[in-house]
């Protein structure tokens, strides 16, 4: 007799079997490469792709969407073009192009995607995902620039002061010492690092030779500056897209420190090469070209990058409401941080009225203009004080420096004018002769060797001698000898009562008296 099959049992067995089946389907949007050339791929089938979205090819290479057209998307490749061919499949990642930033990046050399390229292994530490492109903080979340960023360069700190949160352009022809000013500024932050209040430095090398970047990293290591510095490098052999995105990676790393209540300095060396890389990418993407074949939004490229430098309001509850804050940063936000930018632009034959230089001059808060003639005369740093300016740094300058060097810029301008007249010969009255003598000696005082930034208190001391005419008896060729002896005397005999007080920004009659007495005693014939 056959067993009767119960309907209830069958249904329960079927139910158990069906419950064990995984019916979830993972949907991935996949496209196909239609065409690839010169670092740009045209892809069909990614109808929902977003601008600046990261795409991934089968071989692991990544690309970033830049053009959204009716029937295809144009994406820039972040790797060699020859590794991608027509017909390859591409998938969306759903992520906007970003970089994973962590404390472990400090002291490392990375590419614009955050991958280490210094051969020291992977980067460790908790990471925060920071978007490469991000809106700058609104006016509500900023405060005025009021804290100095000491460069250690006498001519800059005295006449063209830079504040934390400022954008100061360094502009000049090739081989005039633009990078040297930026590197000296980074080296000068060593004292802040040792005092426990570091200014984290990000040096972005765009389109430079690999050997140049290696030599620069070596210099920073020798001076102990890599302890608080990150180098982002996109060399001349890297794809144009990497050179284009490198400054955005530097800004994203700087924002990580800025938004967590710390101070950062980012150097873009140089934005002329970024503009050329962007022009190359835009032309291959067949975007309409404008003046000098640059795309129409080249101004917006630099303005949106440099606007990200800011001094954040010192109220954490307000700072936490900052616009476009990445989710990974929400619980780390503190107020009072800053991001200072030093963009570098290379001019051709001193032409500051060219397209890209005028754009960046109008975006930044001032410029340091370097001249080939001054450089060749031995006036280094070769700063043309007449057309160099700092529009907001004056509010951040130390009071002692402002008192001592307040007239230095005008004095030097008058000296240059009188000097050009004196070349015609003829007799000079005593006042003119004194002005020229003082100007020549001040010019000598402002000359400074490379990689030897000077603490601000020593700058104030020696510039006091120059501006007050205390070098009247010192021969012109002995000014540097006097400077070395004078500063050595202050370090050995007046560290606490003069230098330490000047460091706080205070100068009084007692200190003035000591400085004048020391200068006179030092040069007694």
Swiss-Prot record:
Coiled coil: none annotated. SUPFAM superfamilies: C-terminal domain of alpha and beta subunits of F1 ATP synthase, N-terminal domain of alpha and beta subunits of F1 ATP synthase, P-loop containing nucleoside triphosphate hydrolases. It is a peripheral membrane protein. Pfam families: ATP-synt_ab, ATP-synt_ab_C, ATP-synt_ab_N. One of its GO terms (cellular component) is plasma membrane. It catalyses: ATP + H2O + 4 H(+)(in) = ADP + phosphate + 5 H(+)(out). Its EC number is 7.1.2.2. One of its GO terms (molecular function) is ADP binding. Keywords: ATP synthesis, ATP-binding, Cell inner membrane, Cell membrane, CF(1), Hydrogen ion transport, Ion transport, Membrane, Nucleotide-binding, Translocase, Transport. ATP binds at residues 172-179. F-type ATPases have 2 components, CF(1) - the catalytic core - and CF(0) - the membrane proton channel. CF(1) has five subunits: alpha(3), beta(3), gamma(1), delta(1), epsilon(1). CF(0) has three main subunits: a(1), b(2) and c(9-12). The alpha and beta chains form an alternating ring which encloses part of the gamma chain. CF(1) is attached to CF(0) by a central stalk formed by the gamma and epsilon chains, while a peripheral stalk is formed by the delta and b chains. Produces ATP from ADP in the presence of a proton gradient across the membrane. The alpha chain is a regulatory subunit. Belongs to the ATPase alpha/beta chains family. This is ATP synthase subunit alpha. It comes from Parabacteroides distasonis (strain ATCC 8503 / DSM 20701 / CIP 104284 / JCM 5825 / NCTC 11152).
């Amino acid at each position: 007799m056959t067993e009767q099959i119960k309907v209830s049992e069958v249904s329960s067995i079927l139910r158990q079997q069906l419950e064990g089946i995984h019916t979830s389907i993972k949907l991935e949007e996949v496209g196909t490469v239609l065409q690839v050339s010169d670092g740009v791929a045209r892809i069909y089938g990614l109808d929902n792709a977003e601008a600046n979205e990261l795409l991934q090819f089968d071989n692991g290479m990544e690309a970033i969407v830049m053009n959204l057209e009716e029937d295809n998307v144009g994406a820039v490749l972040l790797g060699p073009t020859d590794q991608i061919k027509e017909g390859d499949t591409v998938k969306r990642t759903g992520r906007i192009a970003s970089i994973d930033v962590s404390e472990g990046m400090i002291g490392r050399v990375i590419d614009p995607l955050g991958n280490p390229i210094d051969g020291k292994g992977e980067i460790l530490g908790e990471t925060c995902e920071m978007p490469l492109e991000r809106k700058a903080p609104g006016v509500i979340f900023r405060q005025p620039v009021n804290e100095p960023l000491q460069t250690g360069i006498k001519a800059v700190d005295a006449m063209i002061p830079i504040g934390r949160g400022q954008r100061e352009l360094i502009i000049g022809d090739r081989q005039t010492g633009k990078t040297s000013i930026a590197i000296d500024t980074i080296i000068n932050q060593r004292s802040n690092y040792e005092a426990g209040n570091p200014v984290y430095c990000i040096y972005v090398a765009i389109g430079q030779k690999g050997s140049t970047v290696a030599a620069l990293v070596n210099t920073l290591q020798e001076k102990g500056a890599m302890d608080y510095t990150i180098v982002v490098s996109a060399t001349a052999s890297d794809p144009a897209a990497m050179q284009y995105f490198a400054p955005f990676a530097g800004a994203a790393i700087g924002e990580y420190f800025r938004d967590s209540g710390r101070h950062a300095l980012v150097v873009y060396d140089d934005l002329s090469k970024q503009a050329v890389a962007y022009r190359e990418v835009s032309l291959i993407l067949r975007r309409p070209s404008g003046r000098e074949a640059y795309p129409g939004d080249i101004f917006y490229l630099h303005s949106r990058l440099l606007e990200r430098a800011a001094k954040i309001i010192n109220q954490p509850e307000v700072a936490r409401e900052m616009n476009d804050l990445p989710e990974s940063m929400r619980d780390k936000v503190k107020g009072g941080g800053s991001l200072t930018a030093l963009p570098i632009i290379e001019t051709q034959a001193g032409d500051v009225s060219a397209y890209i230089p005028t754009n960046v001059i109008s975006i930044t808060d001032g410029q340091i203009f370097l001249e080939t003639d001054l450089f060749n005369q031995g006036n280094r740093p070769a700063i043309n004080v007449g057309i160099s300016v700092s529009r907001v740094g004056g509010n951040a300058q130390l009071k002692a420096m402002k008192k001592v060097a307040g007239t230095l810029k005008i004095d030097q301008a008058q000296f240059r004018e009188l000097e050009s007249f004196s070349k015609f010969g003829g007799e000079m009255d005593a006042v003119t002769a004194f002005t020229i003598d003082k100007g020549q000696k001040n010019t000598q005082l402002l000359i400074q060797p490379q990689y030897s930034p000077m603490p601000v208190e020593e700058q104030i001391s020696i510039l006091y001698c120059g501006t007050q005419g205390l070098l009247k008896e010192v021969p012109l060729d002995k000014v540097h000898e006097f400077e070395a002896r004078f500063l050595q005397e202050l370090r050995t005999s007046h560290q606490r009562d003069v230098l330490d007080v000047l460091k706080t920004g205070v100068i009084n009659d007692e200190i003035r008296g000591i400085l004048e007495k020391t200068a006179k005693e030092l040069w007694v014939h």
